[in-house]
């Protein structure tokens, strides 16, 4: 009886060890969605085209509405040509973290560019001072967003 009890405890300890090892992977910081090119997160006060849009390299679009769920849609990968051209523009590397520079911490929309040069840029969509490369990128994403 004592031996079977010890074996049971040993088996339970091994199981907990394995589960904790598996669980440590999920507690690491979230990685980028596989195949994601860009994500546009509209601020909570957006009056037109609300929601967060993620664009994937295979033509997949996912539109999230807070806790209400997500809509999915696919476009032909050729429809992403303008966005991919905007993402390869060398001028993107010169963009700052926010536009205008005085934008408050939680204000504005956020554009996240995925890939090897991952970065997030916050901007005021009503600002007339956005750099042309950022305007082009936003226009490409919003054109895809308008398909919903």
What are these regions (language model features)?
Residues 50-57, 72-77, 117-127:
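Short amphipathic beta-strand/extended segments with alternating polar/hydrophobic composition
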Residues 22-45, 79, 94-148:
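Short, well-ordered, aromatic-rich surface patches in folded extracellular/luminal domains
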Residues 1-20:
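Sec-dependent bacterial lipoprotein signal peptides
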Residues 61-95:
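A short-motif feature that recognizes glycine-rich, charge-decorated loops
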Residues 42-72:
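Post-signal-peptide N-terminal segment of Sec-exported extracytoplasmic proteins
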């Amino acid at each position: 009886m004592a031996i079977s009890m010890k074996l049971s405890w040993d088996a339970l300890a091994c199981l907990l060890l394995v589960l904790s090892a598996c669980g440590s992977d999920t507690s690491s910081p979230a990685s980028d969605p596989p195949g994601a090119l860009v994500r546009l997160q509209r601020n909570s006060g957006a009056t037109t085209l609300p929601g967060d849009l993620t664009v994937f390299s295979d033509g997949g679009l996912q539109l999230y509405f807070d806790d209400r769920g997500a809509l999915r849609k696919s476009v032909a990968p050729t429809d992403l040509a303008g966005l991919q051209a905007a993402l390869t523009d060398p001028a993107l590397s010169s963009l700052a973290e926010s536009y205008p520079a005085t934008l408050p911490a939680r204000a504005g929309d956020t554009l996240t560019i995925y890939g090897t040069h991952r970065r997030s840029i916050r901007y005021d969509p009503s600002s007339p001072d956005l750099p042309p490369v950022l305007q082009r990128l936003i226009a490409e994403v919003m054109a895809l967003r308008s398909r919903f």
